Amino acid sequence: MKLLHLIFLLALTTGISAVLIYIIGVSNLYESNRFTNEDLEALQSLQNGFQKCVSANGLGLQAAMGRDYCKVSINFPKDTVPKWKDPKSGELEGLSYEFDLCEAVATWEQVRNSSTILTKEYIDALPNGWEDYAWRRINKGIQLNRCQNKSLCIEKLSLVLPETPPYFPRQFGRCAVIGNSGDLLKTKFGKEIDTYDTVLRENGAPIQNYKEYVGEKSTFRLLNRGSAKALDKVVELDEKKQEVLLVKTTIHDIMNKMIREVPIKNPVYLMLGASFGSAAKGTGLKALEFALSTCDSVDMYGFTVDPGYKEWTRYFSESRQGHTPLHGRAYYQMMECLGLIKIHSPMRADPNRVVKWVPSRSTIRSARIAAEKLLRRVGAGSADPLASCSIVKKRNKNKRPMVSHLRKPVSDHQKFVRSTSMYPVEHSPGHGQLCITPAD
């Protein structure tokens, strides 16, 4: 009887302790996620500085506060005459665009700490990664019955699927992303572009015959679906045959055949993607995404962002339909005024141009923390960089990526994230990340 009484008291005590631990844990979690007056002030400061930055640097663009401290609208002058029409509705492009600064600072900061190249460890670590995801990165992958034959899927992806990340946050110093705009022919940026540590180009944009305008250095080339199908022609654009080719869509059998038979010796990888919704589109944004995930600073050329820009042009061929040019110009101005990029164009040709009223890093950091709380992001309010990990897997000891030979900012960042590879999880509620941690 005494034994039963003792067991009852022990169970009661244990239960109370568990409840207390739960309450304390929830309380601490609530405290770290609680939106404070300081958070509100951080968003106010960001929005005020952002308005001044757009006014000072936007060449006629103006920013106005939106419905709350996250929303802003970027407005074109009333005398702007849009030319681009929606191919489906036939409606002309608008002159005012609303953006969510909270979404932007939170998402782009996550990009800065992520690997944006698809790897085998990423697919392996995803819940049902081969059955639910891998086949989507293969052209006509739906015919593969959700990769029931895993070996076949591995074979189709093998030429573009590294085991671990080939590049790391902060791996490169100064980076330039070169668009294809016809405005590049108005200013001879070539020598300036060649001074960057890393240069990223897009699709089939040529270098030969345009070197004084676009430079000749080329480190990476980002390819859309059409360009990826013509890999054999793309590699001829790089005389030194050293470009790394980044494909933003899927792998095709014709691509695999060209890589094997041409042969194409340039590394070819598939990109992962952060989730920007409908905020911005196009190869240019993906190029900036990769650059921001691997570079200390990012400058952009050839995106045609000056007044009078109403349609897509190309420096090497006839104009094409493109998509929402005014929207693109507004989005890139938002990026510059969040300190993400620096724009170079015929009207901003001075390489020493100072972008005025860019928010400080401390302002951006405080606003990001506040934004993550409002957006209910995974790990919001925590100082731990791994708090955003919604999926955590251990890495095989024999598959650890080598970073010891890379520049100091890489090793510093690796210490900060405790040698963890962090990937965006596409379409993830709360924008959680997939994290591969070192083996014990």
Swiss-Prot record:
Lumenal side: 27-440
EC annotation from Swiss-Prot or TrEMBL: 2.4.-.-
Highest taxon listed in the record's lineage: Eukaryota
Coiled-coil ranges from the UniProt annotation: none
Record-annotated membrane-spanning stretches: 6-26
Knockout mutant characteristics: Male gametophytic lethality when homozygous. May be due to defect in pollen grain germination and pollen tube growth.
Cellular component terms per the entry's GO annotation: endosome; Golgi apparatus; Golgi membrane; Golgi trans cisterna; trans-Golgi network
Entry-linked Gene3D superfamilies: Glycosyl transferase family 29
A GO molecular-function annotation: glycosyltransferase activity
Matching Pfam families: Glyco_transf_29 (PF00777)
Principal localisation: Golgi
Subcellular location per the Swiss-Prot or TrEMBL entry: Golgi apparatus membrane
Bilayer topology term: Single-pass type II membrane protein
Family membership noted in the UniProt record: Belongs to the glycosyltransferase 29 family.
Role description: May be involved in the transfer of 2-keto-3-deoxy-D-lyxo-heptulosaric acid (Dha) and/or 2-keto-3-deoxy-D-manno-octulosonic acid (Kdo) on the homogalacturonan backbone of rhamnogalacturonan-II. Required for efficient pollen grain germination and pollen tube elongation. Does not possess sialyltransferase activity in vitro.
Protein name: Sialyltransferase-like protein 2
Gene that encodes it: SIA2
